[in-house]
């Protein structure tokens, strides 16, 4: 009898397939990186074909490592880098252009034109999002405007849009031969095209953005059987879809109003469960769908999205060559006692929450001859913690709820220096769970829930346990002095791009 749930976790830098048992433990997994394509400054692309090839490869690899076959898997869920935009031919499966990645800033002109009538918050009341290069709608518009024949093909229904979840679900369920063209509410809520109240595409916004409705996928719940897989997972129900940050909320079992988590990946993303209530933000956060299980009402969240955190460590490694592996940043940072008076604001693709400034670019401030590479490494880690503090402050303002602890996950949570500094600068305990692969786990939970492998959220919550807690050890005066320095540094990034 099938006794495991599988997740495909398609992230910004790599794709994983993870297989979990009923207790939420990882049984086996496989992972492969894919190429980051930078055609021009501010442009970031992926090859959709390479991503699909990597996906098939990691499914094979995970099954093989676990000595398993498709018959051992009850269901498969998909979680994905959100906003990243693919437009492809529904007859051949061929993309008309590379995937335009969430960090890509090429749509700034489109966003400015749209904001000329009604400002950056023109659509916020309906979609919960500001006009920003981050979201999919303007990326679709760019492809339709710039790829020859794309608009005509879209209007004729020959080419279709999807975020990565949609593209993978379509291929997993047969591609050109009957592939299912769907997206879940969490991914749809990141396009700028879905109305948060109706959970359907908004015709007025589609018309303003110039996007034909017929190219869009059907919006479905995050947990239900969408179709059956072909290929390596032949016969397995494809039954869960969640954007990566929403998947981490489910994996962290943040099912109650007021529960929050922060995921440290390429960027960092803090979400706060607001229940079935849509809470508009006055502090630069996003209002987003957290999850929708079957025919139960949708649950919403406030989100603070930070563009660059883990990516800054990669930059230190790949662009400066100061370290050879990302893990070495901790040892380098520990060569010094503090940041030597420097702050590093990584506005490589503008600033996301709570500023939403696409004109910002990265700065290192406070440099003196005293500063060495250890200070630089420490400033790199501290940047992640300071940006998280800004988001936490905004969340407390919007929700009126004071956070008592922060659940954390993602690759950087094994960096003790960073996690201790995070607790210090927030002034609240930081908690790492036993299973830190919460994004994949959330997708597996959504899929397993749809087929009855887990009968309810209480069963999932029972699986959650604490691995490590960091408590604040910094005095209030030091905390606020350091944070003031950060706020000052951030202002130096503004108005850089004309």
Curated annotation (Swiss-Prot):
Alphabetical keyword list: ATP-binding, Glycerol metabolism, Kinase, Nucleotide-binding, Transferase
Recorded GO MF terms: ATP binding; glycerol kinase activity
Residues where ATP binds: 12-14, 266, 310, 314, 411
Binding site for glycerol: 82-83, 134, 244-245
NCBIfam families associated with the record: glycerol_kin (TIGR01311), PRK00047.1 (NF000756)
Summary of the function given for this chain in its UniProt record: Key enzyme in the regulation of glycerol uptake and metabolism. Catalyzes the phosphorylation of glycerol to yield sn-glycerol 3-phosphate.
Similarity field: Belongs to the FGGY kinase family.
Protein name, as recorded: Glycerol kinase
